[in-house]
């Protein structure tokens, strides 16, 4: 399959940006799904810890992007579990 893509790119060089953008988008989507699967507290891979979000403190940032929130200055306002 890679050989066919390279032969098409040699015959039609205008397809090269299309292959680059599709490859970049696919790799970005894969990395984002990997990030969600490994670092999101809503996903639990360990059956011994069914509620991993209870271990998160108010200083832990698990959002992908937060605009104006400084997580280091937040107080703990919930009970320990």
Swiss-Prot record:
Keyword Cell inner membrane: no
Residues in the Mitochondrial matrix compartment per record: 1-14
GO-annotated cellular components: mitochondrial inner membrane; respiratory chain complex IV
Modified residues (N6-acetyllysine): 10
Function: Component of the cytochrome c oxidase, the last enzyme in the mitochondrial electron transport chain which drives oxidative phosphorylation. The respiratory chain contains 3 multisubunit complexes succinate dehydrogenase (complex II, CII), ubiquinol-cytochrome c oxidoreductase (cytochrome b-c1 complex, complex III, CIII) and cytochrome c oxidase (complex IV, CIV), that cooperate to transfer electrons derived from NADH and succinate to molecular oxygen, creating an electrochemical gradient over the inner membrane that drives transmembrane transport and the ATP synthase.
Family per similarity comment: Belongs to the complex IV NDUFA4 subunit family.
Protein name per the record: Cytochrome c oxidase subunit NDUFA4
Organism per entry: Pongo pygmaeus (Bornean orangutan)
Gene name of the encoded protein: NDUFA4
């Amino acid at each position: 399959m890679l050989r066919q893509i390279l032969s098409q790119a040699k015959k039609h060089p205008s397809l090269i940006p299309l292959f680059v953008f599709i490859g970049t988008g696919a790799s970005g989507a894969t990395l984002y799904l990997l990030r969600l699967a490994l670092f999101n507290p809503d996903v639990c891979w360990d059956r011994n810890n069914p509620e991993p979000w209870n271990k998160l403190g108010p200083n832990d940032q698990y959002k992908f992007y937060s605009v104006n929130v400084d997580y280091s200055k937040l107080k703990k306002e919930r009970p320990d579990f």
